């Protein structure tokens, strides 16, 4: 694996019976992740059992069985390579708690892959109104996953097999479906595939001579190709936000003998270097970073995606906590929010939400109760147009612009500026009842707070 | 180290094979009414009990005004649906009868013609329109014919699916458990975590991963049945071990 390839994350969504795990498995098996010895072992077993002709199925089954036992925690199981990218693939589970993870979790997807099954009735069941697929697709779009690929799977089991008519029918239906969510179908690659047999996965299939390839039109440049892997290669690479201001939400804070206080977190935007004078919002504590480490190795520079620990002087472990955000004191430093305005989509609340509702919000690593101070307007999710001013209440399926007030000091940002700090899950009764993206933040005045001697010295030294 | 070895090389494969064999033999032996049965019946009882109490809980949550009204409406709709279905099948019968009659009559009068068939199909589609509304389809642009085809396919699919064994949806999760400092004994922490048990939860492999400045975290994988185990519950349970655990983060969350 050379170092020149860019890393991207994709999330695979679709009905449980869409064959998305088979498709995911196919990609990982053929292009990645699983070490050669494991595959060779399973392939040999298949031969010995006289299942040579079903070698592929056998290996996939074995890998699944291995996952079910949880006997490996190798994250490589979910990685593969294309010509251009290293890909980490998330096979979206149906588990209800997955939604929260989609929002606060470690990897924001750069592209979503929607898998639908071409089999009679299977497609229709898969994209039914109440399906989880719709919810996942809607969430992906809301959370800023603007690229989409559609795999029309199980083409081998359409009637008749590899039917062009069926493919066109599904393509039309899915186009209107994703358009309702907000995607532009012209910018979406549609590929007829069989994850099981491998048609149009890595190589163009001879079973579908009618398929002339997929095409996408987008302002960053058009693309075309024939296979699913081509479509993955045509994903626009994410702009890694190193040129933005530093934002590092704290996960943990350690006190280490002989070293001192060590906050740990992931750099979301910007860079962190030894010597940076950082401020921790919302507590507004300023100090100097002595050194930065990742996996026990000293770093001269931590970039977005790096999970790092850094050593700060004159700050006690009690002054910092999970949910605080570190930023550069001299370049657009983070501040506490007095209140903020967000677009909230109610997913699955049993009753009605009115002004005064105070659930817990999970935003980056923070976990703080916030009050729905004012539900300003109900809006059309797609266009953002107001459909009702000052609604008395909102319920499942509604989108609304809401003013929220945190019950304790909290640091958040507008989604436009700092996406990972600008999206949140609304938790109530151990469920994700709503999700939101922050439109604007009314920051508190950053007066008061503590400036350590180390910070003073570092600042003076530079003058 | 041990774990890494497991990753690459399956030394105790025979043990797993044996375990797998036992697992698959298990249910069959039970049907033989062997010595397993008291335990099995005990489990069955417990399951029933859980099922009952769950149903009761459902009942309770359904009790607030809005939902019971919904339930009523649902029941009503279901009734109507049944009624309409019978009516539709009646109409179908009538229709085929008429078509036959028409055909024979037409044959008698002026040979074979396809027109009556076309005419006959139209009313059928209209009949089914009522059915569509019942399914709560609110997309106005959809014409009756398309909806009918969709419903037919769904029905065929449902029938096909009913025959298939339902697969239990599971997820594979990797949790990062972080200690307080470099002095926390991760081994004891792990032992304590593995003591957390729950129906549908299976602990998997684990390893210690360096974080920074001599601190290590525990990465532990588990497999959960989606309907049985809440990940919030699980992280809360782990965070209750507050002598050891500072925080829990989800490193990976995938469908199996």
Curated annotation (Swiss-Prot), chain A:
Phosphoprotein among keywords: yes
Top-level taxon: Eukaryota
Region described as G1: spans on this chain: 14-21
Gene3D superfamilies recorded: P-loop containing nucleotide triphosphate hydrolases, Translation factors
Intracellular or extracellular location(s): Cytoplasm
Region annotated G3, chain positions: 91-94
Family: Belongs to the TRAFAC class translation factor GTPase superfamily. Classic translation factor GTPase family. EF-Tu/EF-1A subfamily.
Record's protein name: Elongation factor 1-alpha 1
Species classification: Eukaryota, Metazoa, Ecdysozoa, Arthropoda, Hexapoda
Gene transcribed to yield this protein: eEF1alpha1
UniProtKB/Swiss-Prot annotation, chain B:
GO cellular component: cytosol; eukaryotic translation elongation factor 1 complex
Biological processes annotated in GO: translational elongation
Basic and acidic residues bias spans: 114-125
CDD domains tied to this protein: EF1B (cd00292)
Phosphoserine modified-residue sites: 37, 53, 89, 137, 139
Assigned keywords, A-Z: Elongation factor, Phosphoprotein, Protein biosynthesis
Biased composition (Acidic residues): 126-144
Disordered: annotated span: 110-146
PROSITE patterns associated with the record: EF1BD_1, EF1BD_2
GO molecular function, one term: guanyl-nucleotide exchange factor activity
Family: Belongs to the EF-1-beta/EF-1-delta family.
Name of the protein: Probable elongation factor 1-delta
Provenance organism: Drosophila melanogaster (Fruit fly)
């Amino acid at each position: 694996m050379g170092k020149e390839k860019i890393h991207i994350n994709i999330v695979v969504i679709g009905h449980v019976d869409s064959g998305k795990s088979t498709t995911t498995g196919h990609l990982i098996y053929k292009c990645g992740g699983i070490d050669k010895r494991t595959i060779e072992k399973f392939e040999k077993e298949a031969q010995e059992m006289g299942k040579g002709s079903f070698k592929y199925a056998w290996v996939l089954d074995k890998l699944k069985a291995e996952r079910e036992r949880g006997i490996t925690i190798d994250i490589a199981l979910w990685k593969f390579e294309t010509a251009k990218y290293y890909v980490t693939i998330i096979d979206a589970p149906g588990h209800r708690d997955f939604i929260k993870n989609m929002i606060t979790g470690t990897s924001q997807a750069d592209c979503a892959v929607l898998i639908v099954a071409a089999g009679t009735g299977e497609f229709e069941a898969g994209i039914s109104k109440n399906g989880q697929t719709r919810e996942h697709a809607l969430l992906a779009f809301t959370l800023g996953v603007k690229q989409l690929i559609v795999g029309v799977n199980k083409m081998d089991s359409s009637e008749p097999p590899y039917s062009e008519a069926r493919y066109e029918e599904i393509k039309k239906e899915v186009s209107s479906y994703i358009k309702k969510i907000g995607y532009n179908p012209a910018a979406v690659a549609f590929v007829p595939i069989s994850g099981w047999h491998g048609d149009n996965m890595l190589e163009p299939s001879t079973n579908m001579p009618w398929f002339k390839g997929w095409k996408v039109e987008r302002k960053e440049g058009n693309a075309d190709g024939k296979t699913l892997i081509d479509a993955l290669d045509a994903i626009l690479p994410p702009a890694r936000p190193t040129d933005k201001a530093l934002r590092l939400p704290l996960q943990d804070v350690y006190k280490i003998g002989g070293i001192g206080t060590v906050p740990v977190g992931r750099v979301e935007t910007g860079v962190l270097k030894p010597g940076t004078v950082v401020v921790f919002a919302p507590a507004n504590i300023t100090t100097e970073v002595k050194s930065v480490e990742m996996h026990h190795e000293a770093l001269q520079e931590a970039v977005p995606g790096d999970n790092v620990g850094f050593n700060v002087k004159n700050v006690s472990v009690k002054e910092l906590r999970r949910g605080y955000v570190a930023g550069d004191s001299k370049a657009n430093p983070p501040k506490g929010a007095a209140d903020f305005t967000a677009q909230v989509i109610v997913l699955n609340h049993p009753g009605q939400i009115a002004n005064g509702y105070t659930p817990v919000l999970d935003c980056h690593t923070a976990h703080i109760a916030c009050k729905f101070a004012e539900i300003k307007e109900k809006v059309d999710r797609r266009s953002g147009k107001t459909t009702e001013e000052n609604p008395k209440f909102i319920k499942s399926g509604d989108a609304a612009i809401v003013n929220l007030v945190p019950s304790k000091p909290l640091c958040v940002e507008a989604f436009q500026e700092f996406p990972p700090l600008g999206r949140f899950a609304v938790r109530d009764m151990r469920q994700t009842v709503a999700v939101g993206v922050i439109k604007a933040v009314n920051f508190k005045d950053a007066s008061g707070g503590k400036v350590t001697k180390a910070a003073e010295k570092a600042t003076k030294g530079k003058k | 180290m041990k774990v890494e070895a497991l990753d690459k090389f399956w030394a105790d494969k025979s043990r797993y094979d044996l375990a797998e064999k036992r697992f698959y033999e298990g249910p069959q032996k039970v049907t033989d009414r062997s010595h397993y049965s008291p335990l099995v019946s005990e489990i069955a009882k417990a399951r029933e009990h859980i099922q009952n109490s769950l149903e009761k809980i459902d009942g309770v949550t359904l009790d607030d005004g809005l939902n019971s009204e919904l339930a009523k409406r649902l029941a009503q709709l279901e009734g109507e649906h049944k009624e309409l279905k019978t009516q539709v099948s009646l109409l179908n019968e009538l229709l085929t009868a008429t078509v036959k009659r028409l055909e024979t009559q037409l044959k008698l009068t002026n040979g074979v013609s396809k027109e009556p068939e076309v005419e006959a199909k139209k009313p059928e589609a209209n009949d089914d329109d009522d059915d569509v509304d019942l399914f709560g389809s609110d997309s106005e642009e959809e014409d009756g014919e398309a909806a009918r085809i969709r419903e037919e396919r769904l029905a065929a699919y449902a029938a096909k699916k009913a025959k298939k064994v339902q697969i239990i949806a599971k997820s594979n999760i990797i949790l990062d458990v972080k200690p307080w400092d470099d002095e926390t004994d991760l081994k004891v922490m792990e032992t304590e975590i593995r003591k957390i048990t729950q129906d549908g939860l299976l602990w998997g492999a684990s390893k210690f991963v360096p974080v920074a400045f001599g601190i290590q975290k525990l990465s532990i994988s588990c497999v959960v049945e989606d309907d049985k185990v809440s990940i919030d519950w699980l992280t809360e349970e782990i965070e209750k071990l507050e002598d050891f655990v500072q925080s829990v983060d989800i490193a990976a969350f995938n469908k199996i």
